[in-house]
Amino acid sequence: MFLLLFFCIFASKTVIFVSKFSYLSVIMNISSVISRRLGLGEKQVQAVIGLLHEGATIPFIARYRKERTGSLDELQIAAIEAENTKLEELERRKQTVLATIEEQGQLTPELRRRIDECEDSVELEDIYLPYKPHRKTRADKAREAGLQPLADLLLKQDPRTDCRREAQRYGKPDETLQGARDIIAEQISMDERSRNAVRREFAYTAMIRTKEIKQLTAQRAQEAANYREYFAVDEPLKRISSHRLLAIRRAETEGFVRVDISCDQEKALDKLARLWLHNNSNAAYEVEQAMEDSYKRLLKPAIETEFAASSKQKADAEAIRVFAANLRQLLLENPLGQKRVLALDPGFRTGCKLVCLSAQGDLLYHSVICPHPPVNKRAEAETILLKALHDYCIEAIAIGNGTASRETEAFVREVLQSSNQKSSNLQINETIPVFVVSENGASVYSASKIGREEFPDEDVTVRGAVSIGRRLMDPLAELVKIDPKSIGVGQYQHDVDQAELKRSLDQTVESVVNYVGVDVNTASKHLLTYISGVGPVVAQNIVNYRAEHGSFPDRRALLNVPKMGAKTFEQCAGFLRIAGGTNPLDNTAVHPERYAVAARLQQAKMSGREVRLEDFVSEEVGLPTLQDIWRELDKPSRDPRNQIEEFRFSEAVHSIDDLQEGMSLPGIVTNISNFGAFVDMGIHKDGLIHVSQLRGKTLALHQHLTVEVLSIDRERNRISLKPANS
């Protein structure tokens, strides 16, 4: 009995040991592959994977674990995470493939070795293809008819073989030869060498071609006109830009064009011939027919689908990269800060919705003014505006950039200039800055669940105006409440992989929020949700605790929040600020785990002696962390964003009809893509600076610049620009 028990314990421990050994070997293999692919040290990769598996976030690893990762930045860590996810999925797929082949009784040691060593999903699927369950094919039917021996005989291509005589043994020669060719065709198509040969030819010579679909209704034909530059595309696939490929695919989805991707057929068949044709015998002729059929019916469609998918994937990745870069710039847009703001959501027929906000963004007052046609209550609008400016001590004005924006801006500036010239008890500071603010996303917020939660008793127009005002005060705090896809800085965002787009944009928002940091005593739950390690549940708990117990006096008090365990605190503490708390370090990016060394550095700094950071290096704290701490001590509670600057459009233009070629106008960059930058000149239609006009210059989202009008296509409502003096 004792021996049996000992054996059972030993056996179970052996299984655990083997499984752990297997897991560790997989991790080591994955680290090695990622290291080669990304050109990073294997120890760096192992450290990142280990930290990710421990539950650490990318912002936390990048900022607070530099010694372990060799100071890898967020992009490098994110790349490791993405590669690790792919390779872990590949490992899971390998196990499925191995199990399936083993069930069939066809798993040899050599086949297992090839699968285990495989590092690419395409290669793995090629290995698996002959064993993969599939619906019955022409070749399957031929095998069931007993024609496999005939196919094998033909493949030998013996010059002495009389093909028709051999075929007659199995039935009617024409039918049996066709069946044998079907078997050979499938065999060729499933052969790794064949597939790789055709892939190489596609990689070198594949062309993407489009053909216009002309049988359209009048309305559909009008819609199709927007895609006319894609009606007769004939370009090398490897050279086509991502935005053109996505536009072509959208035109295909809309039913305006047919798309074909094909390589040089003659060269592809020549490559296959080198693999499968050995002489000029009659049997070789049968194999050649099967080979051509295999290419046209099986190989080309399969490889075309592969290249269509891979090219789309690359285009998606590039579009998502551009979107994420634009989003990052938008989230880091310069804030006005905590000032009292009057915000206007402009309009003609329904008037302009006016709201006044406190320095904390609370709604104090709202009204509607109608200074424009068709209502034309200008005097009343002026009175309401002046009273609101006076009563709420307004320090800045935000005007949405939608319909009637220019007219509303002109009205406001005129009122400010003339206010103190009129006999009135309301003395207004005519130098109150006026800002035109993007409305993108404001209407989405106003109708959203978040908007309803924040202002349950107000209608959508009030919520929209509040969003415009708050966006001026702190773009980051307001934009996190809006789905990034609604902000309007994407490129073909509805055409790309939606899951990958969401992952990338969420990662971007998380990165920016943690880069800036948030005041835990004032931040909304929506902003707190993106803090490293927090999430929606803990964010709500922080807000609830704050409401019940008042402001947090220090970071340690966060541990009293429900579900704020030690791990969550470790991940989030450095990114949460406490202004005016009991410990000045709580208002910096210094992590509580490094307060002791920060205190020693501060003491050395205050001594007036020269401080050598190298003298403070220890086993736990290296030079990179010490440099970060020193920067925080040098500029505590700093905001990495700059102060917003006032901007004015030209008074000479209000619509595309006012434009002339050669005009120089002030503008704001509203969107950046691979093919150029879009610029708002205050005429409700953005112009395009084509990438060829930038000449290596890099523009930033919402950058102020002067542009020159190159050309105007009024029929298509398009404006071409270039940077002035370029």
What are these regions (language model features)?
Residues 57-58, 73-140, 145-171, 515-643, ...:
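Accessory alpha-helical DNA-binding modules that contact the DNA backbone or grooves
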Residues 200-207, 344-348, 402-404, 427, ...:
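A glycine-rich phosphate-binding loop feature that marks nucleotide/adenosyl-phosphate handling sites
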Residues 100, 114, 251-264, 274-299, ...:
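Structured, non-catalytic alpha/beta "coupling" segments that mediate domain-domain communication
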